[in-house]
Design a protein with these regions (language model features):
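Glycine-rich oxoanion-binding loops at beta->alpha junctions
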Residues: 84-94, 113, 204-209
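Internal gly/pro-rich beta-alpha loop/helix module
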Residues: 100-101, 106-196
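Small-residue (G/A/S/T)-rich helix-start motifs and N-terminal tracts that mark the onset
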Residues: 1-82, 101, 156-158, 169-325, ...
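Short acidic loop-to-helix transition motifs that present clustered carboxylates
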Residues: 85-88, 140-144, 167, 331-334
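Polar/charged alpha-helical tracts
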Residues: 90, 94-97, 372, 376
């Protein structure tokens, strides 16, 4: 796992390390030299090379001055400019035009707001540098807590951050400004990080293998979704769950006609009580609850619509279902902000809202700090929350959180969220712990998009790509670019 520390947590780690006896100037020397080594490597050497370093106040600027000194020791011609003394823009522009590398040491991870004055000018001017642009800890202009950018920000080709990743380097648009991120160990005592970016090995170890004597009912999944004209959603969920390892999937949809449309060769469809309009009716809750204990997981919501009777059925299912539950889409909307049914549950729950569903459920916008938003809802609901969108956050409250870095904008198409719910359901059916089922589900979802290809991607492509994506996860193989 790659630990992630917020700026506040990093400040505490710095103080803890200094209090334990490591002087701040020693930490600064290590940090600056780590930056200098990165610049040297990316320039391809030092002979005849030129570099520009722009420094701000505080530790970030100090790291930049150490990097400049180290580069000079190695024979690089270095031009240093400081924000505190004022940047001679004419001289700086000339230096940038002939530079082989640029070092951004203006602002660190504690930055908030917008760059102005010389800092904003430098952020725009560095595009003239043909060689590497290396940011110290984080590109100047990027909010270290959220990744937000307000106005100008440095576009780095490389970022050397210290001891742990920062949220602003993982969330967009900050991640897009950071380029290739190198984490340099400078001897900071990180304590016990609660946020991390999971890697292949972490996730593979958390996915249970099927026992030699297993049978299909040991890993069964029950899917409840669909309404008139929306039968594709539960079908996507069902087939994704099977591809992710469910031994048998029943797909409950309202009415005989909907059941016929949602059917598939491998998936067993069941017609549930429906209203005259083809929506799930309240008596359906009794049928679902009667069958639920035969299954290892229940996935509820995709395509259900927003009929009041459907919402009543969903609320009862949520409160009374005795098995792990994945609640998505209209299943979340059915709660209408009432978290009581979730808190009443005796079995684990995974919620998978996008930003709009989050508002409906939590009664507030996600805001810029996605990490804090996911953790708040997880604590209030007593559930694992997977907050969808760029930089997916998986949280189970204050205990731990993961940030998924696979996938991309090509997944923003109809039905892909249904596939994600199905993957999580399949992993839960295999016996994965809910937090890890959600984290591995998000990771696999993104990898499936890489297998399927990005341009023109549709939800069905993801399902076809799941076996290869899951196989690469279980075998610890990196996908070829």
């Amino acid at each position: 796992m790659r630990p992630v520390l917020t700026p506040a947590e990093m400040g505490e780690a710095d103080r803890r390390t200094i209090d334990a006896g490591t002087p701040v100037d020693v930490l600064m020397e290590r940090a600056g030299r780590a930056v200098a080594w990165n610049v040297r490597r990316e320039m391809g050497g030092t002979y005849g090379r030129r570099s520009v370093v722009v420094c701000g106040k505080g530790n970030n600027g100090g790291d930049g001055l150490v990097a400049a000194r180290a580069l000079r020791e190695w024979g690089v011609r270095v031009d240093v400019f400081t924000l505190e003394g004022g940047v001679d823009r004419q001289l700086c522009e000339r230096a940038l035009l002939r530079a082989d590398a640029f070092v951004d040491a203006m602002f660190g991870t504690g930055f908030r707001g917008a760059l102005d004055g010389d800092a904003a000018w430098v952020a725009g001017a560095v595009d003239a540098v043909l060689g590497p642009c290396v940011a110290v800890d984080i590109p100047s202009g990027v909010n270290g807590q959220t990744g937000a950018v307000d106005g100008e920000a440095v576009h780095a080709s490389h970022t050397v951050t210290f001891s742990a990743l920062k949220p602003g380097l993982v969330f967009q648009p900050g991640a897009g400004h950071a380029g290739e991120v190198e984490v340099a160990d400078i001897g900071i005592d990180l304590g016990d990080p609660t946020v991390f970016v999971p890697e292949l090995l972490d996730l593979a170890l958390e996915l249970p293998e099927r026992a030699p004597d297993a049978h299909k009912w040991l890993s069964g999944a029950l899917v409840v979704g669909g309404s008139g004209g929306m039968t594709g959603a539960p079908s996507f969920v069902s087939h994704a769950a099977m591809r992710a390892g469910a031994g048998i999937v029943w797909c409950g949809v309202p009415g005989d006609e909907a059941a016929a449309r949602a059917s598939g060769t491998e998936v067993i469809t069941k017609a549930l009580p429906a209203t005259a309009d083809g929506a799930l009716d309240e008596p359906a809750a009794s049928e679902v609850l009667k069958a639920a204990d035969r299954f290892r997981v229940l996935v509820v919501g995709p395509g259900l619509g927003r009929d009041d009777r459907t919402a009543a059925a969903v609320r009862r299912i949520v409160a009374e279902a005795p098995v792990p539950l994945v609640l998505d889409a209209d299943g979340l909307n059915a709660l209408d902000g009432d978290l009581g049914p979730l808190r009443a549950r005796g079995a684990p729950t995974v919620l998978t809202p996008h930003a709009g569903e989050y508002v409906h459920l939590a009664g507030e916008k996600v805001g810029a700090d996605r990490l804090a938003a996911a953790r708040r809802l997880a604590e209030r609901a007593g559930a694992v929350v997977l907050l969808k969108g760029p930089g997916e956050v998986i949280a189970d409250g204050a205990t731990r959180a993961a940030i998924n870095t696979t996938g991309g904008p090509w997944l923003a198409t109809a039905g892909t969220g249904d596939v994600l719910s199905g993957i999580i359901g399949g992993f839960l059916a295999r016996g994965a712990e809910p937090f890890w089922a959600a984290a591995a589900g998000a990771f696999t979802h993104g990898r499936a998009a890489d297998v399927a290809g990005h341009t023109g991607l549709v939800a069905g492509d993801l399902i076809a790509a799941l076996p290869a994506a899951i196989r690469s996860l279980e075998s610890l193989e990196s996908l070829e670019e």
